């Protein structure tokens, strides 16, 4: 049976977002939401017919909120809003981000507080399910009043305007609708505002980044475990007794992950008089990785709330009361997404340091730069440079966006969140850190092969090593390889969900204890 996810505004999960955004799973509006949506719309119709003054329905927008709009102009007002607010810059957002945006906006609207017609929500849903993906520039949002510019670009194709992708081809909005067999719509009172006023873009990008960060945390534990086996790491820093007396959840989970990955390994050791303890990048993996786990668990808890929230303005209450408030403001997510970037940056930073330990012959006791006949061959020399470059770039990107604000709209919107910038930066940091962790896994596998043909790895690390070596070759000499290709293969291998799934079938990995 084909899977379909019901959208009720209450129960959407981050896993659902991934399924719809990346796997093309279909979705539908839950029957339980229909009554609330219709009731909310009736209230808006009454407002227009009664000529009541309500922001964004019978008034202008932003600092123009005191300009009254006649009932006969309320429809034109909404289309004008979309045409002028679609003012983004930069490259288009990737398909998974656009699909996540469409999904989260629909899920917010079906809660029944936005005064939008059911048919209009269904039109956006039809675009999503039929694979019409609006062209949305990545830049241009202040994260308050919501993500106005990018969401306006999302709406344009619904009106037969703008641009959209359909089956991989960039078309005019109308062409995309025609090829998909979708009719365009006209907006009714308040609908333009309901579609674009909210934290949807920053939340969608941040949700994808958060999900990927959780996978990266597990991969970083695996990378650290492999590096420990290269260095014959001392096992006592991972004993449960050490961590129960400082019961930070992420720290406890990391120590357990390492123990699980190393089960049965012949490449670890115990402390001796000649070797009392390992360096921080090995010994303190639970404390370093664990701190990032706790941070990202917090971010996920905020994402779980936001993807099921109403971030519109004004809000149409079920009793007919209309509230002009600030739920569109991105600050509640801007700070967590800055935190997300910092947490991921630390993972890349410590992984790069372990790459350095692997390629440094004085620290690894292996040939310089993990290649036979160093000098004639340079091996992993510049690979470590590249990781250092990414780690340093992350440190710049990790500067918080949410500490900045520029007043806008004639100082009516005088404090903004920059939350969309925070989410986008977090995703860039994630991509950089993913490359670094992939390189650590590749370097650790190379080092293990240089040490011995009989690895006797742990239960989890052996599964990872065997899978990795099916795709990524041992580097014998510089002459016969282009290391760039092998690095790309390494990233592709660990990006494939089946890689981590196979490891987790062998051993349990978690981010919280």
Curated annotation (Swiss-Prot):
Keywords: Cytoplasm, Histidine metabolism, Lyase. PROSITE patterns: PAL_HISTIDASE. This is Histidine ammonia-lyase. GO terms for molecular function: histidine ammonia-lyase activity. There is a cross-link at residues 144-146 (5-imidazolinone (Ala-Gly)). The gene is hutH. Belongs to the PAL/histidase family. Contains an active site 4-methylidene-imidazol-5-one (MIO), which is formed autocatalytically by cyclization and dehydration of residues Ala-Ser-Gly.
């Amino acid at each position: 049976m084909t899977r379909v996810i019901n959208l009720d505004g209450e129960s959407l999960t981050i896993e659902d977002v991934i399924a719809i955004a990346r796997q093309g799973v279909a979705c539908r509006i839950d029957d339980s939401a229909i009554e609330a949506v219709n009731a909310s719309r009736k209230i808006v119709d009454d407002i227009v017919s009664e000529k009541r003054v309500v922001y964004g329905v019978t008034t202008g927008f932003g600092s123009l909120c005191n300009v009254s709009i006649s009932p006969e102009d309320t429809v034109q007002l909404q289309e004008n809003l979309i045409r002028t607010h679609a003012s983004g810059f930069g490259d288009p957002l990737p398909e998974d981000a656009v699909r996540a945006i469409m999904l989260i906006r629909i899920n917010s609207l079906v809660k029944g507080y936005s005064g939008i017609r059911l048919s209009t929500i269904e039109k956006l849903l039809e675009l999503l399910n039929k694979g019409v993906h609006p062209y949305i520039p990545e830049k241009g949002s202040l994260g308050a009043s919501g993500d106005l510019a990018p969401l306006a670009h999302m709406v344009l194709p619904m009106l037969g305007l703008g641009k959209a992708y359909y089956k991989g081809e960039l078309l005019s909005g109308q062409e995309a609708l025609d090829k998909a067999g979708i009719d365009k719509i006209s907006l009714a009172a308040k609908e333009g505002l309901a579609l674009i006023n909210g934290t949807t873009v920053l939340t969608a990008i941040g949700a994808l980044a958060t999900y990927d960060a959780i996978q990266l945390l597990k991969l970083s534990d695996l990378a650290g475990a492999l590096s420990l086996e290269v260095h014959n790491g001392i096992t006592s820093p991972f004993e449960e007794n050490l961590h129960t007396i400082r019961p930070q959840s992420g720290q406890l989970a990391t120590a357990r992950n390492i123990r699980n990955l190393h089960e049965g390994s012949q490449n670890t050791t115990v402390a001796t008089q000649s070797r009392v303890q390992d360096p921080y990048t090995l010994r303190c993996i639970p404390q370093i990785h664990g701190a990032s786990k706790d941070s990202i668990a917090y971010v996920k808890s905020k994402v779980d709330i936001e993807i099921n929230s109403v971030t519109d303005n004004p809000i149409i209450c079920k009793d007919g009361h209309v509230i002009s408030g600030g739920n569109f403001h991105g600050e509640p997510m801007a700070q967590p997404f800055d935190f997300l970037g910092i947490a991921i940056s630390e993972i890349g930073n410590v992984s790069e340091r372990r790459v350095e330990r692997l390629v440094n012959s004085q620290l690894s006791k292996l040939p310089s730069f993990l290649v036979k006949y160093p000098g004639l061959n340079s091996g992993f020399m510049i690979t470590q440079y590249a990781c250092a470059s990414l780690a340093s770039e992350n440190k710049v990107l990790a500067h918080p966006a949410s500490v900045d604000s520029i007043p806008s709209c004639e100082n009516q919107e005088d404090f903004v969140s920059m939350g969309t910038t925070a989410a986008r930066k977090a995703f860039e940091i994630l991509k950089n850190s993913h490359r670094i962790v992939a390189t650590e896994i590749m370097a650790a596998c190379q080092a293990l092969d240089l040490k011995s043909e009989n690895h006797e790895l742990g239960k989890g690390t052996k599964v990872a090593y065997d899978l990795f070596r099916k795709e990524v070759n041992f580097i014998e000499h510089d002459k016969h390889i282009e290391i760039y290709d092998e690095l790309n293969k390494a990233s592709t291998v660990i990006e494939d969900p089946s890689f981590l799934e196979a490891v987790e079938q062998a051993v349990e990995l978690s981010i919280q204890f």
